Amino acid sequence: MARYLGPKLKLSRREGTDLFLKSGVRAIDTKCKIDNAPGVHGARRGRLSEYGVQLREKQKVRRIYGVLEKQFRNYYKEAARLKGNTGENLLQLLEGRLDNVVYRMGFGATRAEARQLVSHKAILVNGKVVNVPSFNVAANDVVAVREKAKKQSRIKAALEVAEQREKPTWIEVDVNTMEGTFKRMPERSDLSADINEQLIVELYSK
């Protein structure tokens, strides 16, 4: 499945909630009909079956983290193999992706922008260039912007946007050096309550 390149607003309208795909703070203007699905008949959002609700939740989380379907299923399989709660394991695996960590640290205004920074070799992990967005960041890893990339206006703008977001307690960032430490994996209580990971577990358990 190819990565979606269309309007970001359409994805948020599809899920009926702001996925923050255009901005790290508030992606959608109040004039936009977020409660209406895209399309001519979007205002008549149909009642979903149990399966439909589970599928929508999976699609919502997949789109928030910018992960393709096959990748997402592989994350679920890995989460199911790990000890503990499968749903929480899944969210931790997604949170540990390098592109997500770069976004959480404020170096990218969105996860898509953070993914681009990683792909363009603008990011270091423990002093070495890593250009794989799905790279798994471990506890105490140091993630930094490469010296020659620090002058990029989009990174400076992203850091300003990040100042308006709630700062993750599991990450420590020095905005002056553009360097951060991934102190630990986030607990479930650290993450958005708008995600119901149990619905995803139920979907894949069928």
UniProtKB/Swiss-Prot annotation:
* GO biological process terms on file: ribosomal small subunit biogenesis; translation
Q: Which CDD domains does the entry link to?
A: S4 (cd00165)
Please provide an example of a Pfam family that matches this protein in its UniProt record. Answer: S4
Q: Which UniProt keywords apply?
A: Ribonucleoprotein, Ribosomal protein, RNA-binding, rRNA-binding
Q: Where is the S4 RNA-binding domain?
A: 96-158
InterPro entries cross-referenced by the UniProt entry = Ribosomal_uS4, Ribosomal_uS4_bac-type, Ribosomal_uS4_CS, Ribosomal_uS4_N, S4_RNA-bd, S4_RNA-bd_sf
Q: Which GO terms describe its molecular function?
A: rRNA binding; structural constituent of ribosome
Q: What Gene Ontology terms describe where this protein resides (cellular component)?
A: small ribosomal subunit
Q: From what superkingdom does this record's organism come?
A: Bacteria
Q: What does this protein do?
A: One of the primary rRNA binding proteins, it binds directly to 16S rRNA where it nucleates assembly of the body of the 30S subunit.
What family is this protein classified in? Belongs to the universal ribosomal protein uS4 family.
Question: What is known about its subunit structure?
Answer: Part of the 30S ribosomal subunit. Contacts protein S5. The interaction surface between S4 and S5 is involved in control of translational fidelity.
Q: What is this protein called?
A: Small ribosomal subunit protein uS4
Q: Which organism is it from?
A: Vibrio cholerae serotype O1 (strain ATCC 39315 / El Tor Inaba N16961)
